[in-house]
UniProtKB/Swiss-Prot annotation:
Topology with respect to the bilayer: Single-pass membrane protein
Bilayer-crossing regions: 4-24
Keyword presence, Lyase: no
Name of one Pfam family that matches: KH_1
Record-stated family: Belongs to the RNase Y family.
Uppermost EC category: hydrolase
Enzyme Commission number(s) of this protein: 3.1.-.-
Gene3D superfamilies noted in UniProt: Hypothetical protein af1432 (1.10.3210.10), K Homology domain, type 1 (3.30.1370.10)
Organism: Finegoldia magna (strain ATCC 29328 / DSM 20472 / WAL 2508) (Peptostreptococcus magnus)
Domain KH: 203-288
Protein name, as recorded: Ribonuclease Y
Domain HD: 329-422
Gene Ontology MF: a single term: RNA binding
Amino acid sequence: MSTTTSLIIAILAGILGIVIGFFFRKSLAEKKIRSAEDYAVKIIEDANKDAETKKKELLVEAKDEIFKMKSDLDRENKSRLKEISRQEDRLNSKEENLERKNASLEKKHKKLDSELKKADDMQLKIQSLIDEKELELEKVAGLTSDEAKNIVLERVKTETIREQAAIIKEIESKTKEESEKFAREIISTSIQRYAADQVAESTVSVVNLPNDDMKGRIIGREGRNIRAFETLTGVDLIIDDTPEAVVLSAFDPVRREIARIALEKLIVDGRIHPTRIEEMVEKARKDVDNTIREKGEEACDETNVHGLHPELIKILGKLHYRTSYGQNVLKHSIEVSNIAGMLASELGVNVKLAKRGGLLHDLGKAIDHEIEGPHVELGVNAAKRFKEPKDVINCIEAHHGDVEPTCIESILVQSADAISAARPGARRESMENYIQRLENLEQIANSFDGIESSYAIQAGREIRIMVKPDVIDESSMVILAKDVAHKIESELEYPGQIKVNVIRENRVSDYAK
């Protein structure tokens, strides 16, 4: 009984334990579920908070982006408005220029009409004079109609020539009295020419080799070295039968100089292959850039011109490698600067401005092979870009007479340029062409009636004409000089100007017995 009871109690205790355990585990499970639900709710709340924060951040970023786009659009609109305003200003300026040109043309037309009217009046006067003389000659006995006509024509011709000579003298006298610039220009052309070296113009450079075996190394396997060299430098490398020498050919002297330096470095180094060629060409390019800058600075020091923009100095230095008719353009610019400075000093005008304008007058020749356009226009654009004074810009654009000079210094630069180019030996000219030009000059002078002899002197800068005093009178000398000058202008090509000097000499001799 005791055992059975114990067993029953044990079973009941086990069942009770199971029931208690079940309810305990159920309670734990419910707690975990509630905890999980709370955690889930918290996650959802945190997620909502993060989403709200992200939303606000995105809104702020969107507003910033919209503000930035609006600012960019405003700037772009302002820039376009400025450009439109500039274009309107340019159009207005062009319109004003056209109006000024129209006014000038109208003035010239009026002047031409006035001159035509004067010519018509002169013609009427001549015709009236002819009629009067014919009436007089009809009364003269013993003269045929042809003889009377010849007498009248000869008298009219003589009177007309005298009237023309008087008019020309009056105009020249009036011009000399009223124009101070014209007087200064005449004075400036009388100053002695400045001497400088002549430089031969060439499109090739010769590089000496230590031996002919070096030619094969320069060519390289299947010509790869020479192809790489020509591609990197833009220069033709000519290898022929000339012993221990090769030739570099190019119209651009800067590229040719870079190629010469690079090739000489390669020959000294001995290692010639495409990679080494590229290194040496780059070094040579830097060397030439340094030389260009040094030459520009030396030119400024030599002419005492300071305050130029570094880029202008570099462009100026490039002129060291440019030649024109055998004349080094940088030396020519220095020469023009010095001559213009001397003229300005003699005339009491701005020496610094004249020297600065003279030094920069051919600036465009340094870049005319890189940018299309005449060298005068390129030089003016460069000077404007680097903020050169207005008078210096006028010196550049007026030195070939393309525009009117606005200051006396521009006229001096123009004169100095002509003097530098025209002085004997400045620019290379073959002896045959030089002699032919002088012969043509004398032939033109001798083609007129009444010429006793003529001589081309001052290297063709002056023609001296001796006339027969019994054929050419003093009033006819003025007409003769003008006619010779006009014929020279129409038939000859020459730099600068040619002076026509007509000389009439009377000699009287007698003998004492």
